[in-house]
Amino acid sequence: MTYLADCQGPCSAFSGSTGDVWVKIHQAGYDPDRAAADGGTPWASKRLPEQNSTWTVALPATLRHGQYVLRHEILGLQRTNTDGNLAQFYPACHQIAVTGTGTAALPAGIALPGAYRPDDTTSVSFFFLLLFFSFLSCFIIIL
């Protein structure tokens, strides 16, 4: 998942820990079409090492120029629900400067920290629900 926050000036004076400033601009997860199309892995986390541990994200073309913090986050589900463990989040933040002629401001986003709770199983439940419906749709197509 990739989030973007507008620093509203120099990022040295910005605190991303208050307010709903983080806007999700990209996400990648389970993609069954990728496996069917080229025999590759459907999991984004498995594709990452195949891409030399790099990930490309396109910024919105209409985004106004300015200073931003880009937060890329890997969500680890490998130990979820084992021994009471929940999903693992691995964030990394980068200060970036956007140049160009765009004039669009970011919409309201979410608060980080605050959007996730240690006892929140929503991401895990949604993950299994997604797998269930993916399986169900495949099952219906086969019939």
Positions of PLM-derived features:
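Peripheral, solvent-exposed domain-edge segments
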Residues: M1-T54, L77-L143
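Short acidic/polar micro-motifs centered on Gly/Asp/Asn
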Residues: A58-L59, G76
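A glycine-anchored, Pro-Gly-centered beta-turn/N-cap motif
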Residues: L59, R64-G66
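A short tyrosine-centered beta-strand micro-motif
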Residues: Y68-H72
